[in-house]
Amino acid sequence: MSKEKFQRLKPHINVGTIGHVDHGKTTLTAAITTVLSKKFGGSARAFDQIDNAPEEKARGITINTSHVEYDTEFRHYAHVDCPGHADYIKNMITGAAQMDGAILVVAATDGPMPQTREHILLGRQVGVPYIIVFLNKCDMVDDEELLELVEMEVRDLLTQYDFPGDDTPIIRGSALKALEGDPEWESKIIDLSKFLDSYIPEPKRAVDQPFLLPIEDVFSISGRGTVVTGRVEKGIIKVGEEVEIVGIKKTTKTTCTGVEMFRKLLDEGRAGENVGVLLRGTKRDEIERGQVLAKPGSIHPHTTFESEVYVLSKEEGGRHTPFFKGYRPQFYFRTTDVTGSIELPEGIEMVMPGDNIKMTVTLINPIAMADGLRFAIREGGRTVGAGVVSKVLL
């Protein structure tokens, strides 16, 4: 059977379910696909299909994730659901499944629990921009006052982590009843789909963002000058435009005098393309792998930042022993390793394999960075952790 062609007729948005264990994330995921496939087409996915999540690797880390897709009235959604709490943490820190918004599932029977808080905090740290709340298991709570109390608690928790708690949509529903086809509860899933469409704005596509190309290789071509190669991460580079070379050394400006792909000359290079960029008047030894080409002023070099880090367990090929303050591994950003030292939060003496931790990192060389940039932690080329820049400091 030939693969059917993917028709991109609606805007595409990435979302995921987050929340405490057993609050109904996977049941809700199944209910969304089931209810929406009846109304807007697409295929329903059963609970056990989603729950048996396949293993995938992201930045050397094994994560179990289930990917489902569905249509709402106005959009196409790719939705990620993770079976285990550790999988969520890894997923959010590595950015394996980037989310434009998240559906926070809270059981009305329990209210917010420790992982509810942890997922909201992680969402804030790793840059999940929007959260919608699905108050689940409402069929099991008769007391209106209790529901209002739980709602208030959730709003307070969101506000505590700088999400707009008072304005966050909260849908009261029952994922199980909706999955069983009860029309009263099915309508709540439709309500949720409407909030997904209206509350999560369409993200800015990579091609519309300021130009950025992480440099992978540098060549000198006699009679033509210096060419850098790499995959355009964001934006567009046109022949004749000024660019900055940022990171490791002092920032310099130059002009793009040519763009080529597969030995053909182009007028421009776009996000997602592997290109060679010819630079005017730049010497081969002035540029190195690990720097970036960028639109002038759009990104700056930094050495010190706060980060959220997941440390690989021994089973994942990570360290067998804990590390302490003063630990100096390499931090792998985009295309290169830079040595750095760490500071642990007050009262924390050591970090065990399998932990996730907030740490402040100081690099020996500056790297072009902004909040949300992902990195790996390595020792002699072996990945021992994954992290995300939560706040640039210096």
Curated annotation (Swiss-Prot):
Which terms are listed as keywords in the entry? Answer: Cytoplasm, Elongation factor, GTP-binding, Hydrolase, Magnesium, Metal-binding, Nucleotide-binding, Protein biosynthesis
Chain residue ranges for the region called G4: 136-139
Give each disulfide bond as a residue pair: none
Extract the Gene3D superfamilies matched here: P-loop containing nucleotide triphosphate hydrolases (3.40.50.300), Translation factors (2.40.30.10)
Question: Known EC number(s)?
Answer: 3.6.5.3
Q: Where is this region: G1?
A: 19-26
Where Mg(2+) is bound, by residue? T26
Query: Which sites bind GTP?
Result: 19-26, 81-85, 136-139
Region described as G2: spans on this chain: 60-64
Q: Which GO terms describe its molecular function?
A: GTP binding; GTPase activity; guanosine tetraphosphate binding; translation elongation factor activity
In this chain the tr-type G domain maps to 10-204
Report the catalytic activity.
Answer: GTP + H2O = GDP + phosphate + H(+)
Q: Where in the cell is it found?
A: Cytoplasm
Instruction: Say yes or no: keyword rRNA processing present.
Output: no
The record's Gene Ontology cellular component field reads: cytosol
Q: Where is this region: G5?
A: 174-176
Q: Coiled-coil annotation: which residues?
A: none
Region (G3) location:
81-84
Q: What class of enzyme is it?
A: hydrolase
Answer yes or no on keyword Amino-acid biosynthesis: no
Assembly behavior = Monomer.
Any idea what job this protein has?
A: GTP hydrolase that promotes the GTP-dependent binding of aminoacyl-tRNA to the A-site of ribosomes during protein biosynthesis.
Family the entry assigns: Belongs to the TRAFAC class translation factor GTPase superfamily. Classic translation factor GTPase family. EF-Tu/EF-1A subfamily.
Q: What is this protein called?
A: Elongation factor Tu
- The gene is tuf
